[in-house]
Curated annotation (Swiss-Prot):
GO terms for molecular function: structural constituent of ribosome. Belongs to the bacterial ribosomal protein bL36 family. This is Large ribosomal subunit protein bL36c. InterPro entries: Ribosomal_bL36, Ribosomal_bL36_sp. SUPFAM superfamilies: Ribosomal protein L36. One of its GO terms (cellular component) is chloroplast. Keywords: Chloroplast, Plastid, Ribonucleoprotein, Ribosomal protein. It is found in: Plastid, Chloroplast. It comes from Acorus calamus. GO terms for biological process: translation. Pfam families: Ribosomal_L36. NCBIfam families: rpmJ_bact (TIGR01022).
Length: 37
């Protein structure tokens, strides 16, 4: 999980989700997991 100021989709399979006021990216590829901090 990478904590970033700006999160973006890295590939086509990445999904942007809003969870508890935070934007997170989930993907089948674990390297693409991101969270806005």
């Amino acid at each position: 999980m990478k904590i970033r100021a700006s999160v973006r989709k890295i590939c086509e399979k990445c999904r942007l989700i809003r969870r508890r006021g935070r934007i997170i990216v989930i993907c089948y590829n674990p390297k693409h997991k991101q969270r806005q901090g």
